[in-house]
Amino acid sequence: MKRVLAAAAVMTTLGAIALAQQPPARPMSPEGSAQVQVLGKWTKPARPAFTLGRETYTDGKWIEIKYGRPLQRGRDLFGSGADYGKAANDVGAPGFPAPPVWRAGANKSTRLMTEVPLTFGKTTVPPGEYSLFIDLKLPEWTLIISSWPAQDKFDPNNKGALWGAYGYTPDKDVARVAMKLDKLPYEVDQLTWAFVDMKNTGGRIALMWGTTMASTPFTAVK
């Protein structure tokens, strides 16, 4: 009997060890960020820096986009015809009708943080933190920069902040900017926000997913 109990104890211990060694489950849409620094300058320090070019970048201002990164996983992302964009937009739920815009990410609302004013066309967005949405209506997408706060966790009773695009209304829009659509010669499986064609005073904010790239130019203001 003692041998049976001892064997059972050993098996229980080994099972617990095996469970402890299993990696944690990965989220369906991992978190990610895109970052860029503008309006700074490269200087030569007294001692060479451990950077490309051995210089130091000083007085730069940060711009960052934080977002959930869904994977395509073989799906038709945007559809066609009358159904274009419907699959990407969140579905409705009791008390939460389907949003008219796309969260352009996954889970928590996509967030833009900027330490410097940004000009999109004729609109200047002050430094601060914003939510990003996209109106997928063709012939071009529209980037929406909104002052709607974001919920860290879904709270249906919190009407002062959004989870994804649920509850979005346009009254807090700070800017609406046309996005140029391009077809990529390859497929991007994981949704990616990026800063492209960058110069010291600005460039383009771009979103890539599948074979679609949507982008819009911006300028950083001193």
Regions found by a protein language model. Give the residues of each.
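Positively charged n-region of N-terminal signal peptides that target proteins for export
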Residues: 1-4
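Targeting-peptide/extracellular-domain and disordered-appendage signature
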Residues: 21-126, 131-222
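Short amphipathic alpha-helical "recognition" segments used for binding
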Residues: 6-7, 60
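Bacterial N-terminal signal peptides
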Residues: 7-16
